[in-house]
Design a protein with these regions (language model features):
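Short, well-structured beta-strand/strand-turn elements
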Residues: 99, 337-350
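Bacterial N-terminal signal peptides
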Residues: 7-17
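Positively charged n-region of N-terminal signal peptides that target proteins for export
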Residues: 1-4
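Flexible, low-complexity junctional segments that flank or bridge functional domains
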Residues: 19-256, 263-265, 356, 364, ...
């Protein structure tokens, strides 16, 4: 696969996009030696690793080589682990890839996107606000026009994440940097300033209590015998398979189904996702294309699961917080022709990740090492739901669910 062996991780490594990571110390002592040599060695190692193992290197070759050039001149004294990680995080920013991330953090680390974000921007316009988030509670609305992030004008906010400095940035880099800046840093108070009728309105995103669902899966029989199941960021939990099985049994007899994947920013794994899809299959079916860097492409299969097949029409709800394996499950339902997907563009996390450990710092890192695609060939991160509707409407009405219910009502006539 490349020059580092995947899988040599520190205990407690998180799934891509998850918020929980092992924190590092950021307090240097008087006797702390200069950690620059180890940091520089791992920066060079990361540069080489991306060249050999990163699935999207060719599309980012120029910007990555610019970031890796003259590293000894760019790395100053490093006195603690937080500063070590900061050097490597800044280097990794050059990839402008939210699916490439470290498996640890410090108090000065950037928050991850999408799991650490609670609103999404296209240009200066808010296109999604995460339900129940601090942004939703603060009053941020889909359609708001943002004029500052954390007190900085948008161009200045983007500059905090654009790397390397002194080069020209394309539209994709700027779009990534804008949403990364909106997620902010762990040590930085967050706010967003929007243009309102009465003038600029700065909304603080601090000191809000955000409730986390306690159940892996939420299930309910909606009027009209529509079985509704929502995954609560649980595609990486082995226990989700049994919880989903129980939810299906609870809703047995539903005439139609809604599978809500709008809260899956942390991704997950196929051992959980395939049994979920399998409940709705009558035979083994291809659901996702895998495109390794150095092997022929092949199609991932899912098999029937659960002892009985769920009949009836299926709607899958997705949005900006549908990430990684959540995206794979959405394109799987579409590719298997077993579900109609409603919502907005998803998190657009490209490829499938492998896990590595850098040799000198021991920091775990995850990089997309192979591409993934819809069975019909569209790269997963470029695929768009056929039924477009606002998926993440903050504290407003659930427009995607309303659209799904209306469509299912028409379908039954």
């Amino acid at each position: 696969m490349g020059r580092l062996s995947p899988g040599l991780l520190l205990a407690g490594l998180f799934l891509a996009g998850c918020a929980q990571t092992a924190p590092l110390s950021h307090t240097a002592t008087l006797t702390q030696p200069d950690m620059r040599p180890d940091t520089l060695a791992d920066a060079e190692e990361l540069c080489a690793l991306v060249r050999t193992d990163y699935a999207f290197y060719e599309s980012r070759r120029n910007i990555w080589e610019a970031a890796c050039a003259d590293l000894p001149e760019k790395v100053g004294p490093v006195m603690n682990q937080a500063e070590q990680l900061q050097v490597l995080e800044t280097l990794l920013d050059a990839l402008h890839d939210p699916h490439a991330s470290f498996g640890t953090n410090s108090g000065i680390s950037p928050r991850l996107v999408p799991s650490g974000a609670d609103y999404w921007l296209t240009g200066n316009q808010v296109v999604a606000v995460r339900q129940g988030s601090a942004a939703a509670q603060a009053g941020l609305k889909v359609g708001d026009r943002v004029i500052a992030i954390n007190g900085r004008p948008l161009d200045e906010a983007m500059e905090t994440r654009l790397q390397p400095k002194g080069v020209a940035y394309d539209a994709a880099q700027k779009a990534w940097a804008l949403n990364a800046a909106a997620a902010g840093y762990r040590n930085e108070p967050r706010s967003v300033t929007v243009a309102r009728m009465g003038g600029p309105d700065t909304l603080s995103l601090e000191n809000y209590s955000v409730a986390e669902p306690q159940e892996l899966v939420t299930a309910d029989m909606l009027p009209g015998r529509i079985g509704y199941i929502r995954l609560n960021n649980s595609l990486g939990e082995d226990a989700t398979v049994a919880a989903f099985d129980a939810a299906m049994d609870q809703l047995k007899g539903a005439r139609a189904w809604i599978l809500d994947l709008r809260d899956t920013p942390g991704g997950g794994n196929t051992d959980v996702a395939e049994p979920i899809l399998g409940h709705f299959l009558g035979e083994t079916t291809g659901y996702q294309r895998v495109l390794p860097m150095d092997e022929p492409a092949w199609v991932k299969q899912a098999s029937p699961h659960g002892g009985w097949k769920a009949e009836g029409t299926v709607v899958v709800l997705v949005g900006r917080w549908t990430g990684s394996m959540g995206e794979g499950l959405a394109i799987g339902f579409d590719g298997a022709r077993r579900g109609d997907v409603f919502g907005s563009d998803m998190a657009r996390l490209a490829g499938g990740v492998e896990e590595y450990t850098l040799s000198h710092t021991g920091f775990p890192i995850r990089l997309p090492a192979y591409s993934l695609a819809h069975v019909y060939g569209t790269p997963r991160h470029e695929w768009t739901p056929p039924h477009q509707v606002t998926a993440d409407n903050g504290d407003g009405p659930d427009l995607a669910l309303q659209a799904a219910l209306a469509w299912l009502g028409e379908f039954s006539m």
